[in-house]
Amino acid sequence: MLTVDLINNNIPRLKLLDSVAKALQLINDYRITHLPVVSEEKFLGLISEEDLLDAEDDKLNIEVLQKHFIQAAVKDNGHFLTAVNASIQFETSVVPVINEDGEFMGVITMNDLLKSLGNFAGANEIGGIIVLEMERIQFAI
């Protein structure tokens, strides 16, 4: 499964001129901890709820927080496990997806990643998972 197949188009994106207050409201509304910031369809980074709460004034534009942007994105043609890895590595609640030109395609949420990971591991199948540990010599026939 490719990352482009998991894009969630319901999560909004921020622009540089959006206010900290607007960003915090969106984070609260969508129950996530990060939002993507985009300018002219180019992905600039993720801004975290923590960095927004640390801002001096909630009337400030997101633009003044650029030094806090997290550069975590995956390519649209990558395997979905790269998105899982990015989410773990950067500790984000969403993973931005970009195309080859760096244009923002959308985000994958942790919920969508967890569902895909469960399907990938066979968690939705009836039965159990058996792990066998054998010495290498027993592999031969």
Regions found by a protein language model. Name each.
Residues 1-10, 46-92, 100, 104-141:
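Tandem CBS (Bateman) regulatory domains
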Residues 38, 98-99:
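Core beta-strand residues in small-molecule sensory/regulatory alpha/beta domains
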Residues 17-25, 79-84:
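Short, basic/aromatic recognition patches
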Residues 14-17, 75:
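A short beta-loop-alpha structural element at the N-terminal edge
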Residues 30-33, 42-44:
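A positional/architectural concept
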